[in-house]
Amino acid sequence: MSASGEISTPRDYIGHHLNHLQLDLRTFELVNPHSTGPATFWTLNIDSLFFSVVLGLAFLLVFRKVAASATSGVPGKLQTAVELIIGFVDNSVRDMYHGKSKVIAPLALTVFVWVLLMNMMDLLPIDLLPYIGEHVFGLPALRVVPTADVSITLSMALGVFILIIFYSIKMKGVGGFTKELTMQPFNHPIFIPVNLILEGVSLLSKPLSLGLRLFGNMYAGELIFILIAGLLPWWSQWMLSVPWAIFHILIITLQAFIFMVLTIVYLSMASEEH
């Protein structure tokens, strides 16, 4: 790619679509992805942050509107869809969570719908929003799938991890939680260091696997769309992009479901009294 950011080869096209719209937190200026090195700790992917917040607000507004206008008569299509989603999530929570918290069902609903909406951004034409961003708003880069950004998925997983610690301490107490980390699986004081390492790794692996699984699947899906658009002639792209998009609908739904299920299971395990 030239210094001006002109796209001249398939390699340039693919690289351009893998760049984030970034803000340098030290200068509060947009980062030029074509003239700077790799991202540092002080760069913020504001495209991922923007779309994740907008989609989260859209979820809240739509569900609030449906709840406010819900009727006991014949429901409309939107109300029916919302009721089906709520019923599905509620049944999942009843089957997998055995505690008494009233927060888990709303949390599971939020996680499922929010992740699903972010995943669905991958079904938009790959050049649509980046083209608008570049030619209308003058943005140097734009990626529109928040869950294809590891910082977003790990941030969500970090929130789940904090809830795991909270519910573990709430149900078992500080002493019980500490004992769980130091006296399992070997119930003898001499094995406390070994137990702490084993249980610590097990505890930390939960948010890591949760975030990286979602990121890996969505990044791979986005990359395949980019490769199809970047390597094939325009008249032949639909032969691969349409079947992949149909198959990808299953992937994005499944990944949202898996993220929700693992969140419920981890919190159920944390809420168990020993």
Curated annotation (Swiss-Prot):
Keywords for this protein: ATP synthesis, Cell inner membrane, Cell membrane, CF(0), Hydrogen ion transport, Ion transport, Membrane, Transmembrane, Transmembrane helix, Transport
Bilayer topology: Multi-pass membrane protein
Cellular component terms per the entry's GO annotation: plasma membrane; proton-transporting ATP synthase complex
Pfam families: ATP-synt_A
Superkingdom in the source lineage: Bacteria
Subcellular location: Cell inner membrane
Known role: Key component of the proton channel; it plays a direct role in the translocation of protons across the membrane.
Subunit details: F-type ATPases have 2 components, CF(1) - the catalytic core - and CF(0) - the membrane proton channel. CF(1) has five subunits: alpha(3), beta(3), gamma(1), delta(1), epsilon(1). CF(0) has three main subunits: a(1), b(2) and c(9-12). The alpha and beta chains form an alternating ring which encloses part of the gamma chain. CF(1) is attached to CF(0) by a central stalk formed by the gamma and epsilon chains, while a peripheral stalk is formed by the delta and b chains.
HAMAP family xref list: ATP_synth_a_bact
PANTHER family in UniProt: ATP SYNTHASE SUBUNIT A, CHLOROPLASTIC
Protein name (Swiss-Prot/TrEMBL): ATP synthase subunit a
Species for this entry: Yersinia pestis
Taxonomic classification: Bacteria, Pseudomonadati, Pseudomonadota, Gammaproteobacteria, Enterobacterales
Gene: atpB
